[in-house]
Amino acid sequence: MKILIKSWLFFLILFVWGCSMNKQITKIDSMQSIDYQLPVEYTTIDKDMKLAYTEMGKGSETLLFIHGLGSYIPSWKKNLESLQKKYHCIAIDLPGYGKSSKGNYSVSMDFFAETILKFCEQKHLDKVVLVGHSMGGQIAMATALKYPQLVKKIVLIAPAGFETFNKGEKQWFRDAMSV
């Protein structure tokens, strides 16, 4: 009985303490207002597509980091800080994500692979090492298959496969990831 009373008392104290936390949650108006704590640059791909990216390190080999679904540049922060000592590191926000342009993009692997190609052409990059996590791994694979001349190596971190999504699933992802 004492254990039961002590347990209830513990949970009651925990509940009251949790309810008394007066932490304000700041509403984010847009991704532009988020401080990445990394230098952010922009480049325009095609007409109205602006890509956000961060670039650091001076190594001779370029690592191009591609985030996963629902992610953005800061997910690579610790990797960038460490790897910039030896490599030229670039992390991008894919179209529709983070600080990059939002639009009615096709969100297919071919679209993202072509975006990676155009970004690399603009930056005069060739023989890059594509580093992709989750959907970014899927994009890295698609890019390497479609544009092998661009890619030296790929590094896959818990990559997605080559799933296909129906129209409703694609719309759900768009709605869920839009701010």
Name what the model sees in each region:
Residues 43-47, 54, 91-131:
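Active-site loop/oxyanion-hole signature of alpha/beta-hydrolase fold enzymes
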Residues 49, 55-99:
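Conserved HGGG/HGGXW glycine-rich cap/lid loop of the alpha/beta-hydrolase fold
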Residues 75-77, 100-106, 165-168:
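Conserved catalytic-core motifs of eukaryotic protein kinase domains, centered on the activation segment
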Residues 2-61, 86-87, 125-126:
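Alpha/beta-hydrolase fold catalytic core
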Residues 67-69, 128, 132-137:
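Conserved alpha/beta-hydrolase "nucleophile elbow" surrounding the catalytic nucleophile
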Residues 138-146, 152-179:
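Flexible "cap/lid" loop of the alpha/beta hydrolase fold
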